[in-house]
């Protein structure tokens, strides 16, 4: 009877989560995952993917600089990641004389490889479950703050006492909303040098227009090399360091991929929220995303109107516009995908079955109020969540005058709380920050953005959380007053204030109209919004942990219950597949270089194509990298479940060979962070044959290909 109840309870959960998708812990693949991967065509064993006793795939897939993924592709530490992951390093080495962003860069020897300050890659050494140690003593604690303090203390003890080598690091991460804790032993290499990068017209082809979009034709890759000391251990940069000898590196397949082929993606996905209740998903779909999209829509339209008329403004605002557009586009795709897949309704169906099964299993005392409590708390937090997101977009992100004011108010607080020494210590760094900000600032553009966004902000902010200055106001008069009279609108104005004594600084801050406006916004945010938001969010987090506990308690080993992404090493797998996002629209899983020429716009910053690449295409001079049909493969799709952080992840075939490089998702499937739908969710990879073609045939850097192990 007990077995029946457990299965009955999980019928509802399994219906929602029991489908392809998932981001799996590589040390825990035995059982359901192993069987499923074999069914999909995998020839490897799980020990080939993760092992502490022998070399395995994990030893060739390091975390790239804390935000991307990467893969080792030679026995000399040659490292492959995305162009957009290495963009900052490529940019840092670029000058007017040597513009590597525009023209590309290819080191002809080890001596020409370029060091990068603060760049690091981190390898996974060992993964251990430490849940019992971390949760020890917490069972009887009901106060969430006290429980969190003890957990932090226990984690610190685990990190301190877990065995490791002197050059390695220990860290502990929470899984399943705090129902499981895992120790990661890692080693970090800090001498990582730039080896090669295609020009942006290849590495960023399509830029903002093609971002999140299929069909895709972006050669999104760059090459680095890991260096180590003479003992092959991590070391700070030194000219005496030597190329790292990896425990494992990926052989590269030239065989290509076809529809239905097995694909495994190994990397470090950042954040997902797959187990949110329907109330939370509805709030994202109907409240949070529309607010964020609404503000950014205004920002982008204003900036674009100026960028189209003025080349100087276009240059200043190009990177800023791209940053704003990135998640604006993602949130729109996410919202559309949630609606199209009926995510809220599916969650509600699952919750109804969940509630019925709890009653049958006589679990009302433990779990009977979960869903009603979720509904109550999400309704209660909604105005504060809306306010917090509006404030984030309005005060801190999209308007320089307001974000500059916020920074100076933080400096003022440091002066009040920590004294003049702290004030003086922070001024220099803040001044450097302002120099960077004003380098790409235009006062009139910022004013116009403010004047239009403030109207949307005031109209959508809950009235009890709206500052008095924005009740019955004239947007044009307000903008004129702030931008004509505040020192926040120019670098010289900000510099003059930062050069004042502490006493003079405080007085000047009191009398500036811009500072006073930002102060009013921040005081409302800090005293009325966040205290309530944090209190309710703490309750929701505790409830989510209990909800996750119930899901785990009633799941079977064969159920597809994977932990949300949290920046740790994960395996996701699927198959090469196209998709149909709308009526009468069906996409193939592959693109070729032909598509680059179809999109080519001479001189365009997004769709220009280098002459040499056009020549190679015209001659069909693809070398050994073209396919049997005489085409040059470029990108392909699969059903692998990825998110931010998977950029640069290796795409691996059934035998453990590298076949591609993950770099994006399709727009229609970006809701996979919240709800994975196998019909719509696809990850986008650049075909490894195109990577090799660009390195060898386009750049003439065949010496790098010679380092690699090619499988024909």
Curated annotation (Swiss-Prot):
It holds the Pfam family Peptidase_S46. The keyword Signal applies. The keyword Lipid biosynthesis does not apply. GO terms for biological process: peptide catabolic process; proteolysis. GO terms for molecular function: dipeptidyl-peptidase activity; serine-type aminopeptidase activity. The record marks 665 as: Is essential for the Asp/Glu P1 specificity of DPP11. Disulfide bonds: none annotated. It is an enzyme of class 3 (hydrolase). Its EC number is 3.4.14.-. Residues 1-18 form the signal peptide. Keywords: Aminopeptidase, Hydrolase, Protease, Serine protease, Signal. The active site is at residues 84, 220, 647. Catalyzes the removal of dipeptides from the N-terminus of oligopeptides. Shows a strict specificity for acidic residues (Asp or Glu) in the P1 position, and has probably a hydrophobic residue preference at the P2 position. Preferentially cleaves the synthetic substrate Leu-Asp-methylcoumaryl-7-amide (Leu-Asp-MCA) as compared to Leu-Glu-MCA. Belongs to the peptidase S46 family. This is Asp/Glu-specific dipeptidyl-peptidase. The lineage of its organism: Bacteria, Pseudomonadati, Bacteroidota, Flavobacteriia, Flavobacteriales.
